[in-house]
A protein has these predicted regions:
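Conserved active-site loop/cleft motifs that coordinate metal ions or position small ligands
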Residues: 187
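Structured extracytoplasmic
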Residues: 1-133, 140-146, 151-169, 177-184, ...
Length: 244
């Protein structure tokens, strides 16, 4: 499940909105179905309709439908672009070992990261990286990213200089091993302020992620969704096996 809290200001105690959704891979992205804080459907009838729509989309993928195949190819390109961004991140910073920290019974290696002066930004996202200072924590045994925190050190222009992300914008992400060998985000926080054209914008979100379940590639996921639809009581969270 994904719970997103939105605040007007980062230090506000109470959020102005809270949205909880069940996130299910669709083969061409993810489908987010609204639920309440306990994971129960807000509207069981609407919940079933959304699952039936997901079932149809997965069935088209399994049957090698042309439109869905093209959508999958587009999704694969987006993932490739994301992986290239991750690779760029490795080159965009210089890392200095700070020390070890404990998180529960796990040992984390902490590194400070500074912009690499030799790095040449080739995309809008990369242009942000060269203006970020922060820290990363690596799980010593698993070699996986456990925590990431950074702050924008100077204003970042975007959109042909009609927009700007302001200095001091901040981000944080916590990651845990949710299943053996599978590390996923469990919490993220984004506090970004800036302007676009002549309007100011603020993004202050705290997101938590829980109840991860692996449902496999589209063919396996389709069977999981069909089994769930075959159950009588979709309002019982214990009867639902897919999503997170």
């Amino acid at each position: 499940m994904e719970r997103v809290e939105t605040r007007k200001n980062p230090n506000d105690r109470d959020p102005v909105s809270v949205k909880t959704t069940r996130v299910i891979p669709s083969g061409t992205g993810t489908d987010k179905i609204p639920v309440n804080a306990d994971g129960h459907p807000l509207d069981p009838a609407e919940y079933r309709l959304r699952l039936e729509g997901l079932e149809r989309a997965l069935a088209l993928i399994v049957d090698n439908n042309r439109a869905q195949r093209e959508a999958m190819e587009k999704y694969a390109r987006r993932r490739k672009d994301r992986n290239e961004v991750i690779d760029a991140t490795r080159n965009a910073f210089l890392f200095t070992f700070v020390g070890h920290e404990l998180r529960g019974d796990r040992v984390l290696e902490k590194y400070e990261m500074w912009p690499n002066p030799a790095f040449k930004a080739t995309s809008r996202f990369a242009s942000i990286l060269i203006r970020v200072h922060g820290y990363v924590w690596i799980d010593e045994n698993a070699g996986e990213l456990a925590r990431l925190e950074g702050e924008v050190t100077e204003d970042v222009p975007f959109g042909l200089f009609f927009g700007k992300i302001y200095k001091g914008s901040h981000f944080l992400q916590e990651r845990y091993e949710v299943q053996p060998g599978m590390w996923q985000p469990t919490f993220s926080q984004y506090d970004f302020d800036g302007r676009k054209l002549f309007s100011a914008f603020s993004i202050h979100e705290r997101s938590s992620y829980s109840n991860y379940r692996y449902i496999g590639p589209p063919k396996e996921a389709l069977e999981v969704i069909r089994k769930e639809l075959g159950r009588a009581d979709l309002n019982n969270p214990d009867s639902r096996a897919a999503g997170r």
